[in-house]
């Protein structure tokens, strides 16, 4: 099937779930997950008009769960019990993975990606040179650009439900500070101001005053305190030694 055929198949199954048991449906969904896994298909793609979300691809990911059966997976001394297979062949993909980091099938990891003990969910796209640091989570369908540093404990939200939600987009060169939480629909880019953060911004937790019927209250927000300077870049520069697979760290 070509992409157009796959899209039409998914839209038909989405409207009629009885088709889920059809062998052709299973093959179509599996083909889409395989394309996502190889980075040949994405849940969202950049264009001249901004980011375009492909809802039918998100639908395919959701439909992948019902026809998958729970099964035990043994990885060395560890045991998992889940529906979604794990990614494998990291050496061939040029991806460095530190135990016990986990990435599900259907997530794309480009050559040069480094996973410290972290988690990457199905539908996510992580581009080259990006490091996902310890205990960080890249949620379902999140789109992460090149040379991004996702610091320890960062949570990037997933967006399989509600279906209309736009995925988190982290564009090239961003540095996400430790324990940041980035939720669905937020775009961190190479410039907001509502829903996305301007390029080279320095952001801290803040609040603003919002008027409610009961009075004025402080509401949490991302507070932009300035732009990155040379000194900021020096402090947050990517350590190439950590990205050289032949260097012991």
PLM regions with names:
Residues 91, 95-212, 224:
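Structural signal for interior beta-strand "rungs" in well-ordered beta-sheet cores
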Residues 1-95, 200, 206-249:
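Terminal amphipathic alpha-helical/low-complexity segments used for targeting or macromolecular assembly
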């Amino acid at each position: 099937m070509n992409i157009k055929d796959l899209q039409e198949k998914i839209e038909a199954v989405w409207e009629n779930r009885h088709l889920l048991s059809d062998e052709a449906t299973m093959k179509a969904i599996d083909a889409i997950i395989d394309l996502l896994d190889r980075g040949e298909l994405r849940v969202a793609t950049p264009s001249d008009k901004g980011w375009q979300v492909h809802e039918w691809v998100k639908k395919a990911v959701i439909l992948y769960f019902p026809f998958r059966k729970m099964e035990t997976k043994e990885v060395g001394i560890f045991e998992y019990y889940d529906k979604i297979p794990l990614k494998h062949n990291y050496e061939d993909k040029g991806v460095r993975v530190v135990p016990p980091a986990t990435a599900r099938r259907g997530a794309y990891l480009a050559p040069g990606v480094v996973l410290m003990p972290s988690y990457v969910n199905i539908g996510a796209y992580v581009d080259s040179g990006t490091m996902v640091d310890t205990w960080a989570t890249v949620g379902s369908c999140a789109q992460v650009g090149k040379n991004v540093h996702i610091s320890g404990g960062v949570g990037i939200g997933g967006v399989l439900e509600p279906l209309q939600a736009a995925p988190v987009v982290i564009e090239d060169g961003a540095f996400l500070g430790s324990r940041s939480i980035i939720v669905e629909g937020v775009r961190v880019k190479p410039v907001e101001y509502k829903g996305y953060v301007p390029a080279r911004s320095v952001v801290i937790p803040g609040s603003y005053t919002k008027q409610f019927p009961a009075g004025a209250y402080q509401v949490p927000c991302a507070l932009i305190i300035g732009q990155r300077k040379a000194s900021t870049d020096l402090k947050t520069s990517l350590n190439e030694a950590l990205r050289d697979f032949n260097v012991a760290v």
